[in-house]
From Swiss-Prot:
Name of encoding gene: MSTN
Cystine connections: 272-282, 281-340, 309-372, 313-374
Name of this chain's protein: Growth/differentiation factor 8
Source domain of life: Eukaryota
Subcellular locations according to the entry: Secreted
A Gene Ontology cellular-component term: extracellular space
Entry similarity comment: Belongs to the TGF-beta family.
Gene Ontology molecular functions: cytokine activity; growth factor activity
Propeptide: 24-266
Quaternary context: Homodimer; disulfide-linked.
UniProt-listed PANTHER family: GROWTH_DIFFERENTIATION FACTOR 8, TGF-BETA FAMILY
Function: Acts specifically as a negative regulator of skeletal muscle growth.
Ranges in a coiled coil: none
Length: 375
């Protein structure tokens, strides 16, 4: 499946690059052959560009294992999107315009996206509804794709409300367990003491890697946690269920997992712009705008440089494509000729909501055309 992008390009080239002929098989010359040729080239490129955009939309959904684009409105996104340091860091440092085509190395990607960071929001659990009927925070569901031995980092982020005067805050994270004979229902995970000064509220992170790994090994032990953060006057500062004006302050888990890219061979090709008169196989610029699709579920990038391949692959280019020429010489009637296709593609990093309203930061392979060639 990882060769899908290449096959799509081969198909598109064959469809749009066949020379027009008359019904009797003879070519129809015109007085402005050169001008018409340039116009035809522009038309070919425009068709290729449109087809490339449609192919990208299909590939993204397929590689993310989504049957359709998640139906999440901008208002819902505003409520769910944490206004927290790790998420803002991902957005601020986003490498959306990377173009490493000058680098001769290639990444040999698998077909499906690889996950690097998962931001999981809490959900309600029946076990967390206490005797008084009030739900307690928090319960986190985890994807079966997360393997405990691949977890590099796991942090619980909580938002502490602002204070009016300097105070010491005692933070306690408790893990819920099945009731013991003595009635115990909690066991401690982390406790910490921190000083807060007047001003805006703050985000605080707590390492929960060991707890997460245990949950992944034994899913039945994941009954949820309770968060407490009291100041010196006994006021609970932890935002567990955001009130008015507290959108984006939900607790959440930030999980980072390993990802080991592979390297492959070197390749070279031509680069052109939209005004180029180059007839040979060439890479042309193409920017994909997700906002134009109405894909609000993609947090970042909002747009990226995808590029596309277009141009002719003639057998006269022997010094550039010797292997194809040898095949044609051995079987001239059995070869359909070389097609202009990507010979180097690289991934893009994407921050997005999946169908379960989880925020995923992952790498989608083969989404940027870095090199074009004839094959």
């Amino acid at each position: 499946m990882q060769k899908l992008a290449v096959y799509v390009y081969i198909y598109l080239f064959v469809q749009i690059s066949v020379d027009p002929v008359a019904l009797d098989g003879s070519s129809q010359p015109t007085e402005n052959t050169e001008k018409d040729g340039l116009c035809n080239a522009c038309t070919w490129r425009q068709n290729t560009k449109s087809s490339r955009i449609e192919a990208i939309k299909i590939q993204i959904l397929s590689k993310l294992r989504l049957e359709q684009a998640p139906n999440i409105s901008r208002d819902v996104i505003k409520q769910l999107l944490p206004k927290a340091p790790p998420l803002q860091e991902l957005i601020d440092q986003y490498d959306v315009q990377r173009d490493d085509s000058s680098d001769g190395s290639l990444e040999d990607d698998d077909y499906h996206a690889t996950t690097e960071t998962i931001i999981t929001m809490p959900t309600e659990s029946d076990f967390l509804v206490q005797m008084e009927g009030k739900p307690k925070c928090c319960f986190f569901k985890f994807s079966s794709k997360i393997q405990y031995n691949k977890v590099v980092k796991a942090q619980l982020w909580i938002y502490l409300r602002q204070v009016q005067k300097p105070t010491t805050v005692f933070v306690q994270i408790l893990r819920l367990i099945k009731p013991m004979k003595d009635g115990t229902r909690y066991t401690g995970i982390r406790s910490l003491k921190l000083d807060m000064n007047p001003g805006n509220g703050i985000w605080q992170s707590i390492d929960v890697k060991t707890v997460l790994q245990n949950w992944l090994k034994q899913p039945e032990s994941n009954l949820g946690i309770e968060i407490k953060a009291f100041d010196e006057n006994g006021r609970d500062l932890a935002v567990t269920f955001p009130g008015p004006g507290e959108d984006g302050s939900n607790p959440f888990l930030e999980v980072r997992v390993t990802d080991t890219p592979k390297r492959s061979r070197r390749d070279f090709g031509l680069d052109c712009d939209e005004h180029s008169t180059e007839s040979r196989c060439c890479r042309y610029p193409l920017t994909v705008d997700f906002e134009a699709f109405g894909w609000d579920w993609i947090i970042a990038p909002k747009r990226y440089k995808a590029n596309y391949c277009s141009g002719e692959c003639e057998f006269v280019f022997l010094q550039k494509y010797p292997h194809t020429h040898l095949v044609h010489q051995a079987n001239p009637r059995g070869s359909a000729g070389p097609c202009c296709t990507p010979t180097k593609m690289s991934p893009i990093n994407m921050l997005y909501f999946n169908g379960k309203e989880q925020i995923i930061y992952g790498k989608i392979p083969a989404m940027v055309v870095d090199r074009c060639g004839c094959s």
